[in-house]
Amino acid sequence: MAKAPSWNDDIEREVASYQGNMTPLAKSLSRITNRAIDGLISDVRAMMERGRYADQPAAIFLNGFADSATIIRMQALLKAVPERYRETIWKSITGQIAHHRMTNIRAIRTLARLNCYAVLDDMLYTTARILSEVAKDGYYRGTFVLQKETGMGWAVDAIKGGRVQVIVDSVFDMPDARRYMDPLVDFSSKTVINSMLRGLPPDMVSKSVDDIKGAMRFRSKREARTVITETAGEAHMEAYKKHGVEQYVFTATWDERTCPVCGRLDGQVFDRDKAQVGVNYPPMHPNCRCTTVAKIDPELEALMRQRRYTDDATGVTHEIPRNFGYKDWYDTFGPGRKDGVAYKPKFKKKD
């Protein structure tokens, strides 16, 4: 027997639609960061071979001066760095050379930065391409939910490309791409240097950096979900402005993974012009799955039918008040229910 339509199912489908872009974006971020890591590994191995790292104590190698081939490699990498960062990095390189401070340890740190910054343009282009589709989807879905809530339909104008770009830039621009990569600069260079100081051979030094890819895969998933949620939220806001919506209702997903902060905000009404991401507008935190719906005029809302919710534990569909929130769900259908029926989790616990 097919499950009856349910209010929160609509919300979950909306969020799932946006998050369908999460895997492609996360994979793209992982691919790009892996390229930076592989570049650093290759550059460091070349340095170690030229400097005969295996034939001397690591401290002596690290404090030795970087050779001309390393400097030439830095110049080549610098060409791929976004122009806004190029001059500052080059001044740092030439300053260290002029003052005889370009040791191998400093060269490793500089190569880590150059390899990470050399992929920023690719990261920005790839992310913008995916988020543009999320922004368009979010605009139309925000409008569709408004039509569904009011029971009225109208022709929807296409969102202009310039507005899409504004939305995307507000969520993820070049400084955001740099913010994403900067921890990798520090982490990867420290990993290389510490591995050398421990006396590891070149192969093990390379593997220690390669192991960072696993941590970055997790981070890429979190970043992808967060920026997608924020993009969809900004697109909803664009739809609200377009159609004269002055207030919105914060809407959380009803399941056991919803955090207490989002649960408390569920159903609360906020003025559109006072929306603040992370305060009263999603995403509230990394991996946030919340969204918003337009606040309908109270007189119109009073004429509308109640919402329906299907209890997963019993399969029974109930009519619920339109102001039924996460706390009500938690106590009535969720883990806090006291009617003798066991709550049916939506997610399996990991061992």
Whereabouts are the PLM-identified features?
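Acidic, glycine-rich two-metal-ion catalytic cores of nucleic acid-processing enzymes
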Residues: 207-311
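N-terminal leader/targeting and assembly helices and adjacent pre-domain segments
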Residues: 1-209, 299-351
